[in-house]
Amino acid sequence: MKFTDAGKLEDNNNLLIVDGLNVAFRWRYKRVPYYTNDYVRTIESLAKSYNCGRVIILADGGSTYRKNIYPEYKANRKDRYKDQTEAEKKEFEQFLAEFANAFKRLQDKGHLIEKHQGLEADDLAAWIVGKRKEFGVGETWLISSDKDWDLLIDEDVSRFSTVTRKETTVHNWDEHYKFDKDKFLTFKCLAGDAGDNIPGIKGVGPKRAEQLIEQYGDLFDIYNACPIDSKYKFIQEL
């Protein structure tokens, strides 16, 4: 099984796209210093379970692309590590070194590793998913616990979380969200993303975002409904 010169898949055309660092944090949280063998086994086991003939593991190459759009992107994360002890710093360095070892092992076994300067793993995933028909890809499985990847879900694109051990697909979408899949971007715009330091509407979190979508519809519907007469300040902020 290999890519042809045209970049298309031959033989088994199902594709596994792995959020490389996201999956590695599974061992970071368990404080396991040496996890290369387990990491490789996990990836190959998932490829077998989902009958994927090609595996692409994605790595973050920085956030330049996103920071050019929004300079405050992830600015809140600097404080997270400023009070680290020397022992904690060494532990994290060991984690990253083992992550590099795992990547090399996977590459030596013939799996694709993709990392591009200025782009994060989900930027690359979005590009690959967008090009999947050109590459002759059949079914695609995204391996990440990051729910932002759900923006990519389609009839032939699904996500599996190694943290919750649950799948998110177009067929079980309503088990995970209280709004239709095409409202996912509206949800993110309203609620923002505190982890990435991206503000949403003042006073609007996930629950209130769901309520607004249920009552008014997508972002354009909400915009067209403004100004909305309400006693609630978060609605007045719209």
Show which residues each predicted segment covers.
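Domain-level signal for Mg2+-assisted phosphodiester chemistry and nucleotide/NA-binding surfaces
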Residues: 1-109
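Extended two-metal-dependent nuclease catalytic cores across DNA- and RNA-processing enzymes
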Residues: 2-7, 13, 80-238
